Amino acid sequence: QRMQKQQSEVEEKRRMEELEQAREFQMSLILQDPPSFKGFEFALHMKTSTEVGGDYYDFFPQDDGALYVVCGDATGHGLNAGMMVSITKAGLFGSDFNDPGSTTTRLNQTIKAINLGTTRMSLNMAKFSNGSFDFTSAGMPPAYLYKSDKKTVDEILIPGLPLGSMKNATFDLEKFDLSSIILFFSVGIIL
């Protein structure tokens, strides 16, 4: 019985070390500080509820001066959610960023082809350029746009399935004037 207890303790220590390694790997995928980008100011906060979570955000500056911003949340927690974040980031780094709708459609096809079972990725994606932004959503909560000239807050809710749900899903694209502040969020991220 004493031997079993020691084996259990060794196994638990190994599992905790693996979880810590997975957490460190995931955090290395996430920018710790917002980027500097002319004409924009960013603030962000992320707090995962477990060692490895599914929260994800990223920024992709383009050669033409546009900026893509993504905010996402994989279903569940733990290693599968962390793997989905890794796959999403890799898929985005391989993207051509034509527009948020087509980029999200292509990313969905990649995620569906990898097939992580029931794990999905909800994602908002925006392209900021020339005082406006194009926006699409794949199953995320709404974003909020504060219009400084009217002092109003508009909810931006675009229906869409989470990434990996259906191979041939497409994602609607809407265009907005960027007047002041936009808020993206998931359970663990405020951007």
PLM regions and their residue ranges:
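… and, occasionally, acidic/histidine-rich disordered N-termini of signaling adaptors
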Residues: 6-183
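Juxtamembrane or sensor-core-proximal signal-transducing alpha helices
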Residues: 1-3
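Cationic, amphipathic, low-complexity alpha-helical segments enriched
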Residues: 181-183, 187-191
